[in-house]
Amino acid sequence: MWHGTIPNLAINLQRLAEFFPDKPVMIVETAAYYSHENDPWAKPEQYAEFYPISKEGQTRFTRELVTEIKQHDNVTGLFWWFPEENAFGNNVVKGWLNRGLFDNHTGQVLPAMKEYNRFLP
């Protein structure tokens, strides 16, 4: 994780609610790897401390994130970084692979999407 852990997020969300009780908060540009295939940025040793680079790791990250932010009434938005990202014939994503919510090989929705959808009202 680039910017901290879920427990650190919880602390910051609580502080934001205390200092700015009338302000909505949105979590933006979040994502988690599901594979390190063909992606020079996805280094297993860099992220394994938090969540393994796997479909299961991405799903667990998403589940824990949604579970945490649903405990904070001031969180009104959750935006995944490039959820439609898919290498299937898409040169735009060269170097930005394996963090979307669709499998690069099949184009099918990944299990993390089910967890992501739990945020919706």
Residue ranges and their predicted role:
Residues 35-43, 47-64, 68, 72-121:
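Aromatic-rich peripheral "rim/lid" segments of glycoside hydrolase catalytic domains that contact
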